[in-house]
Amino acid sequence: MTIEREQLEMDVLLVGAGPANLSCALHLTNLVATYNERATRSGAKPLDEINVAVIEKAAEIGSHQLSGAVLDPVTMRELLPDFEKHGQAPLEAPVGDEKVYFLTARGKFAMPIIPPSLRNHGNYVVSLNKLVRWMGEKCEAAGVNIFPEFPGAEMLYEGDRVIGVRTGDKGIDKTGKAKPNFEPGVDILAKVTVLGEGVRGSLAKQLVERLKLDAGTDPQVYSVGIKELWEMPDNRFPAGSVIHTLGFPLDSHTFGGSWVYGMRDRVIDIGLAVGLDYRDPRIDPHHEYQKFKTHPLISDLLKGGKLIRYGAKAMPVGGWYTMPQMTADGVMIIGDSAGMLNGERLKGIHIAIKAGMLAAETILDALVANDYTRARLRAFDEKFKASAVGRELYKGRNFHQAFDR
């Protein structure tokens, strides 16, 4: 049976409402407005109204983002220069006290010098879901269309050129058959589609496999990050405090480490990252996390506290050599979907924001030229690699590989 589907035409479609895509959408609307103002003043032809849409599978923007992160603000200052002023952005606290420990089963050794990659002076502890929600509000105020509960199901092609995305059908039973409340997904057509759907995004996997965008790259390597939010009875771990640890509960052959971040209202974010390339098949990352909480450093910290949220997510930690070709005809890949995470620094938000801005600049050029081919969009690959965040990833290109030796 052929299903009739509604078609929605956009100029730019962004799949996933994370930091990369939201920064892209916001920066693009600002760039288009600036371009049209200059064109009007100079007598040139301005662009027609540009329709930008963000689709997100979650019920609310930010609800699939796990709280707790340390933000390097350098790229956010480029996107929104005043974000630190007047309490505009939902920042938990500037990083204050920092410690790095090597843990044994019952003891700890403080590192006398914090490794440069883990120094966070000048950075901010943030709640990522609050930050993303705030960025979404900025986008909507700028005229971006944001559609929550619209998961992307499959790419739409003309030959090998991407022309949009089909959203998921609703009202399907467990066997795949339509129920009485069946609603077919929508075909959203766009001149440029930007995939920023997070690590191992389903559409990015389809695209990379079909167009062989990972040819000549190393296979991506993943870690799983397990974290909890605890509400404490007192201010024993002030907002802005940061701890990172190595060692227990992981053995010397397993890639990973832990963190504790102090947030507002006596909440702490505590987590453990475990490389999924572990050698011992008996390792269970969730069990390792429970062991981690039995260490005296952590158990004493959590005493009397209340668990208020739990979550886990995969992280792409393979680095520079695992990143795919990020553009093809009509499409771009950014953020975690493209492996834009610095595993050495445990940071990716600032990289995602800059990638979104560079993608927006490339899309503006494509809109002006009315050219959405790989030949035009590949400028993004080049801009990203030449940028400060690209150089940062290149500098740490062998970090994970060093653990395999």
Language-model features and meaning:
Residues 20, 60, 200:
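Conserved Rossmann-like nucleotide-cofactor binding loop
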Residues 4-20, 53:
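Beta1/beta-strand and adjacent pyrophosphate-binding region of the FAD-binding site
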Residues 312-343:
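FAD-binding beta-loop-beta segment adjacent to the flavin cofactor pocket
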Residues 125, 337-350:
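Glycine-rich phosphate/pyrophosphate-binding beta-alpha loops
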Residues 45-50, 339-345, 357, 361-404:
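Active-site-proximal substrate-binding core of FAD-dependent oxidoreductases
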Residues 30, 46-48, 129, 133-134, ...:
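Predominantly flavin-linked oxidoreductase catalytic cores and closely associated redox partners
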Residues 1-9, 37, 175-185, 336:
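A short, basic/flexible loop-to-alpha-helix module at the beginning of a structural domain
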Residues 27-31, 38, 45-106:
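N-terminal FAD cofactor-binding segment of flavoenzymes
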